[in-house]
């Protein structure tokens, strides 16, 4: 079993695949270094002398600079490494010389649902979407009272509550409206009840305008203040929606029609070595099959955005990526926040030292394929291949944004563990085997086998594709079995 990994030949650190005790001789890639102190799993150890102020190199890229001289064998972390990041950057388009679509592969099929508008779906559910937080508990009771309608091919009745829809203004209000309308359009929802109170800022007329053309059999509306008994009214509506949803049956659909979101949260020092590269290889495999993948978490691209921007398929896509990256930095600056106020305490405990360190691991989920499009918050994926989406690093907010963009399911890598799930089925992918064993009720797929030397990234990615096909065909994720699913909306404005 390997002790450590030397990710790039030019790196001056290695990453411990397992805890390394002080005095242990570590041999990797022709290097032989004795650990001068204990090195926790996922953490970095110097394998070359590093001077004060010299860059610390990992993934072949500077992840910060040393704040003290370090001899080979030194533990390199927050006590002796600091970020190099600052504010906005003027980027130039330097497309990778080998920028080209990956060779095509005949797509496999999964057993999914074909909607009347031609779109594919992997779940056949009825959703209740509240337009305002005031009706959250009403929506929950409607779900509880009508579980008998979940029969036949209907796979669930769910609501996604939130605290917004009123006391919002301007762009913040518009953003909420756009996100909720996007959820109503999601193909996994066979039928939708839009539930409002009646006096909120997000009016029925505004929501209809945002939603645009819709199938009146698939989407129904109920305003609680307009009826004597909202529960009786909801029962009548939900019966009609159930009759509509019950007509859909699973049938073979090519994998090329899948949209898969890619997310990491509770990351550790192995995220960029095991789970995220596996997801990246999966993303490339999806692109070869004509499918679509979505990468977001813009603040966690800071410091590594060059890896992605040089892969933009053309200058127009590059300009959109540049505007997205610098726009998010300006968002931080406008709130008097530093752009590099990341990683989290849990990330640091797991071995991630700086935002560059975290970002270099994060972008591994993007694989090697060209970036085909950059889309805004609440906008749908319309281009096949790898897409970048405007969204924060926050797990709940970014996963909700990917669902709203049309992701049928989400791949979520984690080194620390999390039970969270978006409305779209969310597969938890552990970076290390101890987590998979400890939290077997959370974890769907273990890439710790890569660190254990049992499988290669290519082998793990193929296994992951097989799992995705099964989940798309109806196999439940661990979170689905527990009934976990929720949303969080990107808030950027005052509360009236």
Sequence positions of predicted segments:
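Metallocofactor- and cofactor-centric catalytic cores in central/energy metabolism, strongly enriched
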Residues: 1-409, 416-496
């Amino acid at each position: 079993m390997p002790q450590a990994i030397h990710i790039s030949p030019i790196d001056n650190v290695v990453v411990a695949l397992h805890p390394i005790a002080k005095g242990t001789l570590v041999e990797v890639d022709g290097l032989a270094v004795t650990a001068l102190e204990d090195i926790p799993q996922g953490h970095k150890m110097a394998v070359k002398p590093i001077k004060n102020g010299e860059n610390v190199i990992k993934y072949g890229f500077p992840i910060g600079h040393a704040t003290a001289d370090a001899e080979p064998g030194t533990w390199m972390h927050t006590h002796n490494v600091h970020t190099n990041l600052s504010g906005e950057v003027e980027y130039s388009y330097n497309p990778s010389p080998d920028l080209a679509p990956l060779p095509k592969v005949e797509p496999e099929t999964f057993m999914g649902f074909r909607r009347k508008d031609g779109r594919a779906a992997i779940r056949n559910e009825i959703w209740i979407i509240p337009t305002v937080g005031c009706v959250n508990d009403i929506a929950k009771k409607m779900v509880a009272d009508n579980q008998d309608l979940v029969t036949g091919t209907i796979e669930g009745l769910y609501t996604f509550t939130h605290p917004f829809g009123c006391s919002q203004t301007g762009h913040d209000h518009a953003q909420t409206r756009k996100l909720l309308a996007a959820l109503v359009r999601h193909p996994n929802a066979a039928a939708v009840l839009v539930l409002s109170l009646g006096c909120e800022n997000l009016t029925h007329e505004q929501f209809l305008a945002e939603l645009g053309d819709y199938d009146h059999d698939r989407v129904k509306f109920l305003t609680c203040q307009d009826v004597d008994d909202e529960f009786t009214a909801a029962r009548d509506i939900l019966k009609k929606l159930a009759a509509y949803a019950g007509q859909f049956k699973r049938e073979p659909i090519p994998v090329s029609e899948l949209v898969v979101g890619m997310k990491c949260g509770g990351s550790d020092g192995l995220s960029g070595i095991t789970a995220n590269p596996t997801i990246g290889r999966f993303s490339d495999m999806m692109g070869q099959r004509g499918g679509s993948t979505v990468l977001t978490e813009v603040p966690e691209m800071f410091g590594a955005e060059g890896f992605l921007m040089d892969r933009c398929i053309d200058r127009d896509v590059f300009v959109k990526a540049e505007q997205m990256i610098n726009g998010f930095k300006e968002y931080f600056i406008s709130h008097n926040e530093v752009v590099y106020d990341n990683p989290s305490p849990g990330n640091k405990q797991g071995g991630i030292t700086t935002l560059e360190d975290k970002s270099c691991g994060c972008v591994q989920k993007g694989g090697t394929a060209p970036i085909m499009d950059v889309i805004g918050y609440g906008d749908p994926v319309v281009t096949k291949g790898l897409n970048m989406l405007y969204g924060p690093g926050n797990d709940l907010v970014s996963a909700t944004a990917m669902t709203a963009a049309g992701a049928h399911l989400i791949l979520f890598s984690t080194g620390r563990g999390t039970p969270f799930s978006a409305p779209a089925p969310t597969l938890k992918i552990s970076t290390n085997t101890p987590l998979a064993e400890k939290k077997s009720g959370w974890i769907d797929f273990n890439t710790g086998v890569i660190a254990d030397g049992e499988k290669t990234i290519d082998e793990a990615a193929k296994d992951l594709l097989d799992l995705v096909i099964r989940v798309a065909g109806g196999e439940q994720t661990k979170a689905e079995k527990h009934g976990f699913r929720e949303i969080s909306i990107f808030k950027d404005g005052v509360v009236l």
